[in-house]
Each structure stands twice: as C-alpha cells, then as structure tokens.
Amino acid sequence: MGIILSGSPSSVNVENAPDVDIQFLIQHVPVFGICYGAQLTAKIFGGRVDKSEKREYGRALFEVKKEDILLKDISPTSQVWMSHADTIIKLPDEFELLGTTESIPVAAFKRNSNGNCSLYGLQFHPEVYHSTEGKTIIKNFLTN
C-alpha cells in the first residue's frame, strides 16, 4: 500500500501551489511522486525546481543510472512520456538519483531514510501508454 502524488498543471514555485504534508505521509505509507508530485517532494526536502528552458511534452529516452527495486525488470534505456514546464535541477542531499533523460538531469529518484525507502519520484508519467515500461514501474512500487 502507498500513496501516489500525481501531476498538476501548476508550478511548485507559485504562491498557493497545491501542497501536502509529505513528512506526515512518509511516516505511515510509502509515497510515489509523479511529475508535479516528484517536483513537490524534491522542493519540500530542500531540492531546487526551476522553470524549464522550454516546456517538455512528448517522448523521451529514460536511462537507468542506479539499479533499484523500483526499476526492477526495466531496460537500461526505455521510452517515457514527459509533460512538464518545471524541472528538478538539484536533488536534496539525502536523495539518490536513479535515472535521467537527455534533456533533464533528474528523471527518477528515491529518498533513503534509515535504510528504508519511503519516497520515490519520477519526472515522467509512467501511467501513460507511451511510457513503454511504466506499468512495470508502478507495479514495482505497489508490490515492493
């Protein structure tokens, strides 16, 4: 069981941006941030999210940088679907980079806390048909 924080047309950097108490959530259940949800978690923990040089919408090639249970059975490179105007530029110190694309430095990450991962984030949309291995990633989150 876990909670998925989805995408949003909003920016995490605007006043009154949608927010959630992630610190509370991760004490009780694993959290999986997708797009806006990933940007929000990175920002809350001290990362940096900036406006993208250009809005990214469409297919991208995801490259696994570090093996992890979230990316179990995922090819070293796979097609993913991007739809975002902001980009995670810098991860918080306790976060680990799991994957990138050609155009963004942070496409997948996790936060380690006492050896347990209770927080994952993806800049891309695994739930979209064009993310060819997205269903596997979601399954990995829900079953591990």
Report the location of each language-model feature.
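Flexible gly/pro-rich beta->alpha loop and the following alpha-helix that scaffold active-site loops
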Residues: M1-I34, Q39, F45, K139-N144
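Proline-centered loop/turn at the N-terminus of a beta-strand
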Residues: P30-F32, E96, S118
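Acyltransferase
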Residues: G115-S118, Q123-N144
